Swiss-Prot record:
Subcellular location: Host nucleus, Host nucleolus; Host cytoplasm; Secreted
Post-translational modification: Asymmetrical arginine methylation by host PRMT6 seems to diminish the transactivation capacity of Tat and affects the interaction with host CCNT1.
Gene: tat
Identification of the protein by name: Protein Tat
Notes concerning its domains: The cell attachment site mediates the interaction with ITGAV/ITGB3 and ITGA5/ITGB1 integrins, leading to vascular cell migration and invasion. This interaction also provides endothelial cells with the adhesion signal they require to grow in response to mitogens.
Source taxonomy: Viruses, Riboviria, Pararnavirae, Artverviricota, Revtraviricetes
Ranges of Polar residues composition bias in the record: 59-75
Species this chain originates from: Human immunodeficiency virus type 1 group M subtype F1 (isolate VI850) (HIV-1)
Site residues, Essential for Tat translocation through the endosomal membrane: W11
Length: 101
């Protein structure tokens, strides 16, 4: 370690701050600019206050609109439960006459 002048404040020690100011750029070079840039830009960690988003309240008129919409039919099970069904004999005969097998 290099000897440091005791009369200097810790934040004014040589090498404690980069010569160029921090920017809003998120390129690789700027993300590794200093420790603050690395934690906020590179890692995405910020300890500032988070703004709470306010929900947009729906006016009363839109609630009436919801009631006027026709209700969708309930989703049915996949497949066709009432579709045509082949008998086992027909399937077996097709399997025997299949030239690809």
């Amino acid at each position: 370690m290099e000897p440091v002048d005791p009369s200097l404040d810790p934040w004014n020690h040589p090498g404690s701050q980069p010569t160029t100011p921090c920017t809003k750029c998120y390129c690789k070079r700027c993300c590794f600019h200093c420790q603050w840039c690395f934690t906020t830009k590179g890692l995405g960690i910020s300890y500032g206050r988070k703004k709470r988003r306010q929900r947009h309240r729906t006016p009363q008129s839109s609630q009436v609109h919801q009631n006027s919409l026709p209700k969708q039919p309930l989703s049915q099970a996949r497949g066709d439960p009432t579709g045509p069904k082949e008998s086992k004999k027909e399937v077996e005969s097709k399997a025997k006459t299949d030239p690809c097998a």
